Amino acid sequence: MNPKSNPDTIFSAPIDKIGDFTFDERVAEVFPDMIQRSVPGYSNIISAIGMLAERFVKPHSNIYDLGCSLGAATLSMRRHIKQEGCKIIAVDNSPAMVERCKLHVNAYRSDTPVTVVEADIRNIEIENASVVVLNFTLQFLSPEDRYALLEKIYAGLRPGGILILSEKFVFEDEVSNELLIDLHHDFKRANGYSELEISQKRSAIENVMRPDSKKDHKERFAKIGFSSYDVWFQCFNFGSMFAIK
């Protein structure tokens, strides 16, 4: 279940000078609508994150949601966690997102406590973790920061622990890449976004979100030492991967 929000009209009117996309108050207000209409398969990913957490969570361990935004993945995991002594740490560097995330988390009663932290995920200590989630977050970090964060996650995971990584993908074959971009734009059109909105959002986000290929992700997982990893979900050029320690 995702929190309701106002409709996303941020890029509906012409903007003279388009700045870089930021997760500010305006975005936080419309985020559930924005992400449902922009990310193919988002609801499926959120639901399955809960199911994956249920399989991999261990008693008396920590679960991390890094780049938690409004807490959709956190809430999905908390609904599925039945083990004793578990704690979810949800982290985001956007004050507007953190404020709303706390409201959403506090609206549901659960035996699994959630701590919502306003911080840079690169500075968070990962320890005693059985599950770590990076849901459309890693792609906003610089390439060198991505590797360092994944190394830190690996070190903080218990043996048998899982990293769930959802990302937008680029494809090495140019024809495939362009086709999947076009299909994604068709998806956005079908969800009511205009050509102006699609174009302006793309201009705003292209400098701050730099996606990797699935091959890049797998090579990184292998180099860091994860024993098993693969794609478990994909819709167009969006998908989710697992990596098991």
Curated annotation (Swiss-Prot):
CDD domains: AdoMet_MTases (cd02440). S-adenosyl-L-methionine binds at residues 42, 67-69, 92-93, 120-121, 135, 202. Gene3D superfamilies: Vaccinia Virus protein VP39. GO terms for molecular function: carboxyl- or carbamoyltransferase activity; S-adenosyl-L-methionine binding. Its EC number is 2.1.3.-. It holds the Pfam family Methyltransf_25. It catalyses: prephenate + S-adenosyl-L-methionine = carboxy-S-adenosyl-L-methionine + 3-phenylpyruvate + H2O. InterPro entries: CmoA, Methyltransf_25, SAM-dependent_MTases_sf. GO terms for biological process: tRNA wobble uridine modification. Keywords: S-adenosyl-L-methionine, Transferase. Catalyzes the conversion of S-adenosyl-L-methionine (SAM) to carboxy-S-adenosyl-L-methionine (Cx-SAM). NCBIfam families: carboxy-S-adenosyl-L-methionine synthase CmoA, PRK15451.1. Homodimer. PANTHER family: CARBOXY-S-ADENOSYL-L-METHIONINE SYNTHASE, TRANS-ACONITATE 2-METHYLTRANSFERASE-RELATED. Belongs to the class I-like SAM-binding methyltransferase superfamily. Cx-SAM synthase family. This is Carboxy-S-adenosyl-L-methionine synthase. It comes from Vibrio parahaemolyticus serotype O3:K6 (strain RIMD 2210633). The lineage of its organism: Bacteria, Pseudomonadati, Pseudomonadota, Gammaproteobacteria, Vibrionales.
